[in-house]
Amino acid sequence: MTMLLPGQSGIDESGNIPWTTEFCAQIKATGVKNIYLELGAVFGHSVVTHAEVCGHLLGQLIDAVGSDHVIWGTDSIWWGSPQWQIEAFRRFQIPEPLQEKFGYKPISTRDRELILGLNSARLFDIDVQAAHKAIPGDAMNQMKMAYQAAGEEPSMTQYGWIAAV
């Protein structure tokens, strides 16, 4: 994504996003079904700084391949805890003016479930129901229960580079 100043979207009247719009159009035109698109740092950055761009990106990606072919990624190795991105995705909705003008569909609860994990589970042939039943007492579940008992206060800490002085 090009560096955009506040108040700029980099999107023309037709909704064109350089590279993304053309790529999505090619996918739709060819009917290719073996492509999965990943939401990573571009979602995190755009949802915070350029919500209109984020709305167009999600609208175009989901329109091109369907919510069943979009997977969640966070680039957390570079940015620390992904919780802030997950919370943003759970709350974000494509703005209604974009839905009306460009025909983007609202992001449904089912879309979010697919994107946040069910699509990846399907790709890796993981039976989600069986996996939930198989690990009720594992260390991760015990940490989750302790976290819930402590009041479920998520960390929104971001990590990054620090300039040497």
Please identify what each model-predicted range represents.
Residues 1-72, 80, 97-108, 146-164:
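Catalytic pocket-lining loop regions of alpha/beta-barrel enzymes
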Residues 120-165:
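Active-site microenvironment of metallo-dependent hydrolases
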Residues 66-134:
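His/Asp/Glu-enriched, well-ordered alpha-helical/loop segment
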